[in-house]
């Protein structure tokens, strides 16, 4: 298991935009599984929505991308580089994510060709899929 401090050595994201709390699994260049504990204290709940707090879907996708970036950037030749979003395809939101949920974020890197990679991300709460998407990364 990798802690938040370990994650910060791999990706450059910091509060308030670091959206993963720990990595439970990391296979360099292949896959990673992260956890985000969603609390009522998240800044985005102030406006999304004040009387009905729901985690924005785009932030779930960003959390998946951060997990995928950990898998890609922990490969020796990519250490110290940045992974940028290059595309999002086939994105679906299936359930709402609310305060108190523990978001499991699983990303499998399905292809790397030069500085471009593709991954498949699935976010779940209590074993139920809440979002899924295909991600494209560009390494710089």
Curated annotation (Swiss-Prot):
**Catalyzed reactions:** a (3R)-hydroxyacyl-[ACP] = a (2E)-enoyl-[ACP] + H2O
- Which residues participate directly in catalysis? 48
Location within or outside the cell:
Cytoplasm
UniProt keyword annotations, A-Z? Cytoplasm, Lipid A biosynthesis, Lipid biosynthesis, Lipid metabolism, Lyase
Per the record, GO CC terms?
cytoplasm; membrane
**Its EC number(s):** 4.2.1.59
One GO term under biological process is:
lipid A biosynthetic process
Q: Name one GO molecular function term.
A: (3R)-hydroxyacyl-[acyl-carrier-protein] dehydratase activity
What's a Pfam family this protein contains? FabA
InterPro entries the record matches: FabA_FabZ, FabZ, HotDog_dom_sf
**Described purpose of this protein according to its UniProt entry:** Involved in unsaturated fatty acids biosynthesis. Catalyzes the dehydration of short chain beta-hydroxyacyl-ACPs and long chain saturated and unsaturated beta-hydroxyacyl-ACPs.
Similarity comment: family membership: Belongs to the thioester dehydratase family. FabZ subfamily.
This chain belongs to which protein, by name?
A: 3-hydroxyacyl-[acyl-carrier-protein] dehydratase FabZ
| Organism taxonomic ancestry | Bacteria, Bacillati, Bacillota, Bacilli, Bacillales
């Amino acid at each position: 298991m990798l802690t938040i401090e370990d994650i910060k050595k791999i990706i450059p994201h910091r509060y308030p935009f670091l959206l993963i709390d720990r990595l439970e699994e990391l296979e360099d260049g292949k896959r990673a599984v992260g956890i985000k504990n969603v609390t009522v204290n998240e800044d985005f709940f102030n406006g999304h929505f004040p009387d009905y707090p729901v985690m924005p879907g785009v932030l779930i996708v960003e959390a998946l991308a951060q997990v995928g970036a950990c898998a890609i950037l922990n490969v020796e030749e990519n250490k110290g580089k940045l992974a940028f979003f290059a595309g999002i395809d086939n994105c679906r939101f299936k359930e709402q994510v609310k305060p108190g949920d523990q978001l499991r974020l699983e990303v499998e890197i399905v292809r790397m060709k030069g500085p471009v990679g593709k991954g498949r991300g699935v976010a779940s709460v209590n074993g139920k899929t809440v979002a899924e998407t295909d991600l494209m990364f560009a390494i710089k």
